Curated annotation (Swiss-Prot):
Disulfide pairings: none
GO molecular function, one term: ATP binding
Organism from which the protein derives: Limosilactobacillus fermentum (strain NBRC 3956 / LMG 18251) (Lactobacillus fermentum)
Record gene name: dnaK
Its biological purpose: Acts as a chaperone.
Low complexity bias (residue ranges): 578-593
Induction: By stress conditions e.g. heat shock.
Protein name: Chaperone protein DnaK
UniProt entry tagged with the keyword rRNA-binding: no
Amino acid sequence: MASNKIIGIDLGTTNSAVAVMEGNEPKIITNPEGGRTTPSVVSFKNGEVQVGEVAKRQAITNPNTVKSIKSHMGEAGYTVDIEGKKYTPQEISAMILQYIKKYAEDYIGDTVTEAVITVPAYFNDAQRQATKDAGKIAGLDVKRIINEPTASSLAYGLDKKDRDEKILVYDLGGGTFDVSILELGDGVFQVLSTNGDTHLGGDDFDQKIMDWLIDGFKQENGIDLSQDKMALQRLKDAAEKAKKDVSGVQEAQISLPFITSGDNGPLHLEKTLTRAQFNQLTNDLVERTKQPVLNALKDAELSFSDIDEVILNGGSTRIPAVQEMVKSLTGKEPNHSINPDEAVALGAAIQGGVLTGDVKDVVLLDVTPLSLGIETMGGVFTKLIDRNTTIPTSKSQVFSTAADNQPAVDIHVLQGERPMAADNKTLGNFQLTDIPPAPRGVPQIKVTFDIDKNGIVNVSAEDQGTHKKQNITIKSNSGLSDEEIERMKKDAEANAEADKKKKEEADLRNETDQLLFQTDKTLEELKGKVSDDEIKKAQDAKDALQKAKDDNNLEDMKAKKDDLNKIVQDLTVKLYQQAQQENQANGGQPTGDQGDGKKDDDNTVDGDFEEVNPDDKK
């Protein structure tokens, strides 16, 4: 019989950890080697799959070794080729999860079938789906995907549920850097904002030491150790050890006897790395973490004075220079009360306890990292859900058709921050068909975005008249990579002015189309009610606007649009005055022309269909 316990797994880029609730406290489960964390490394040797420390020890010397596979989760088409067989990131991750599951079962003494798995706050829909798939392959029912900073805050906040606090979580792991701002109060954990650098972590600090050792050895002996795989493996291990040593003491001894051979026999590498040298080598890496912190604060609309506590997460936060920088930047002493390698797994175990009912009065509110919406007329990206919106969430908006008797609408689902659809990431496409023939703007198409508790997106479109419905669940091969998220945000900042201009141009074209369409309807209604000269004047102005649009002359289009607008408004006023006079002449009885059923289009966005303000229908 399977255990009713839900284990909490921190599936990390460099290291992973697992914990379980024991009574009221989460407890880290050690691996067979006695380690409290397990390297996220898989190696294949003579048909045998090895995971963890034993795989890490051959990471450079054995070409059939896979590490940092997490950085490829959700990447469409990505595989690793091992001994003629292709493996997806989900399959490699599943091997790590299977290993963790097995030693967790040995500890618990029963079969484990359910887990809570953490992901970086930046993980998008595709990457979250891929993580769930990896769990499924490993034989785990993933009950919840939660953000790593949320999990670590849960670990820190369990004993202080009665206090309202705003917390900054600074998470510098092996391969990625994340910073999140959270609000804790009354047992509710709400993410206010997230930011980070997906190419920055402890591995980069190791590489700085390796480069320093390689350069020094080359200068002294004329031999490039970077070309020697066996030497590189030893250098990698020595660099990681030196980083840890110099984080605890003022200097570290690096001794690698028989590192290679020269013309006169064996050569040895002997070096002393001081903390000051290490700080100098890695200063640029520490500095790179500042801007994401400032960005996260800006997105949360907070200042450092609003932050009550700073939590350090990830093994790389043990580096003294990192701690000093965080203290200097925030003006607060960072909280070290929980092992930074273990906080995420402990928090995941607590969430497992919440799901089984063992932990009471705790609610997690995560956020979506990027805005979601659809493409509307003119190639505009119309957002339905803004980034940093708390999930789970649902948002609906009513649109309409852009042409008379339009039989179908294409729903182009996008994720990103740019105003034009082409500059954002396509998540999926689907079509709502069999729309009954009707004039443009009459059909009511309700588009709904649902994001579940795991951050997975479902989009539906429903014809309000026929109640015909179509929907799409965004699958893993259509998501964004972390790199794309970073690129989008940077592009959005760098191209803000150009984007604004494109958006204004698209809006002008949409307004022009709407005015031309409305003018045709108005002129048809005015026939016989105003003079032919007035009709001709309006028709000439309409033709002039049409020509400016066809010539793509934006300045002329703007001027001609204003001219036509004024003429049509004057004619409409005249029409209403005539109707009012007729009404008075008829003794106050309403005429058939008043309240002609036309809806107010002032708030209409002409989309791939046309947006209708639902309030206008009330």
